[in-house]
């Protein structure tokens, strides 16, 4: 073996040793950084947990986490150490998402995360079988997961002012205890089938959507006593509305109604109705009243107005029928002479 070959082999061996050492050094540095980052995360979680604990109160026997107007874009996993919480009240915190571990808070009764920037509801929400109220209004939610139907204790659901929700999964009809539903200021073009099939629903707000017509099956909501449909594009009301025997409040202001169906006279439980700002084909003026307060102003297009309109509509129809029959009558008289 020549001297140069020996020298080359020695250099290669030294090079391998140094490369191995450099590689090991880089790995050690990487592990050290990861360890430091882990320590930082642990420390931050502890600090966050300490801050969160300061926000926990007990009111009326409930353990409540209440945060208002403080920045919490995400919630740390250390929050799981407070899994006995029964109520979350987090408003105007900039919260971007509901944590995936939400399903582990089995004692939650109220989850109010309104006025944040949440874009989706995690499927784990369906694990909250004790949840009675879910308030997610004023967020950026576009869809609702079918897993929400597993929240079998849910009584109140508010999704108002998310602006982009246009439908609900049919599985939500399984929410047998839901009595209150707010879907106002979204993009619904019709009342979802899931809503029509909610057996206990008593209060529904679908104002400020894009509803153009109401389904004939509207009367399936037999328990409904309050229905808000203001600021839509509704052009007519189905005859089946007369079957909604429990309906006491009906708001239809700012729509495109041209008529009020006579069958609404049969709705004897109706106590408040509003037809203001609709292009109704008949002009009806109520008799003057001494009362000049705000309630009287509302009544101008309220229950008394509705009954007066229906009566006027019938009178107009009778007059038209009379006029259409008159020529044939005159013709008959002429033949008899």
Swiss-Prot record:
What's any one GO cellular component for it?
Answer: M band
LRR repeat locations: 84-105, 107-128, 130-152, 153-176, 177-198, 200-221, 223-244, 246-267, 269-290
Highest taxon in the source lineage: Eukaryota
Query: Which key words are in the record?
Result: Cytoplasm, Leucine-rich repeat, Muscle protein, Repeat
Which Gene3D superfamilies did the record assign? Ribonuclease Inhibitor
Expression sites by tissue: Expressed in heart and skeletal muscle.
Give the UniProt subcellular location, in the record's own words. Answer: Cytoplasm, Myofibril, Sarcomere, M line
Pfam family, any one: LRR_14
Concerning InterPro entries, the annotation shows:
Leu-rich_rpt, Leu-rich_rpt_typical-subtyp, LRR_dom_sf, LRR_domain-containing, LRR_R13L4/SHOC2-like
Function per UniProt: Component of the sarcomeric M-band which plays a role in myocyte response to biomechanical stress. May regulate expression of other M-band proteins via an SRF-dependent pathway. Important for normal contractile function in heart.
Q: How does it assemble?
A: Interacts with MYH7 (via C-terminus).
Name it.
Leucine-rich repeat-containing protein 39
- This chain's source organism reads Mus musculus (Mouse)
